[in-house]
């Protein structure tokens, strides 16, 4: 399968690579429809292709990059990828923050982080709420902030339903958009 070019250090299987391609494709379509300038469109594309670059990495590989002994294993991949990208010379704060916080959210995100958060949830390969998610994905170019709020709500409701921990950043993100 071909798709977005990943860093040589990426640890992803074929399913994850397909997800990354769908997320990046959705971000690219939104950027074109919204007529973003070239720099912002590239930031969205890069955030999409890098957000899960370490998703299939083990905690033993990722935790030393992150340096947080208490971070849940499933959350390590975003911060680890951001650290690695920064070491490799990436300087765009909006891209680094988008990648770093894409699993839990971040209240001080610029549009790049918000777009990635939505694309990660709304990409068409996910199997839950297909009709609702497709509708929301189509609305992003005309109601970016409204759809973002709804996606944050969806993620928060899912977190509560599953009995998962609500992270400080997630609560702060909700409070910033409600």
Feature map (PLM): residue ranges:
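Divalent metal-dependent catalytic cores for phosphoryl transfer on phosphate-bearing substrates
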Residues: 6-14, 18, 28, 34-149
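Internal alpha/beta core interface subdomains
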Residues: 149, 153-159
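Charged phosphate-binding loop/patch that engages nucleotide di/tri-phosphates or the phosphate backbone
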Residues: 157-178
């Amino acid at each position: 399968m071909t798709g977005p070019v990943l860093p040589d250090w990426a640890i992803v299987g074929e399913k994850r690579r397909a997800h990354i391609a769908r997320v990046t494709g959705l971000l690219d379509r939104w950027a074109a429809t919204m007529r973003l300038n070239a720099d912002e469109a590239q930031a969205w594309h890069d955030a999409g292709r890098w957000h899960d670059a370490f998703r299939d990495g083990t905690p033993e590989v990722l935790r030393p990059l992150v340096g947080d002994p208490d971070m849940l294993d499933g959350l390590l991949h975003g911060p680890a990828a951001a650290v690695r990208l920064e070491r490799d010379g990436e300087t765009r704060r909006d891209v680094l923050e988008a990648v770093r916080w894409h699993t839990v959210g971040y209240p001080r995100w610029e549009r790049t982080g918000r777009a990635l958060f939505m694309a990660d949830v709304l990409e068409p390969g996910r199997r839950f709420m297909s009709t609702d998610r497709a509708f929301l994905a189509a609305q992003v170019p005309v109601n970016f902030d409204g759809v973002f709020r709804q996606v944050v709500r969806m993620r928060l409701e899912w977190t509560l339903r599953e009995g998962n921990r609500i992270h400080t950043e997630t609560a702060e993100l909700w409070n910033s958009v409600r």
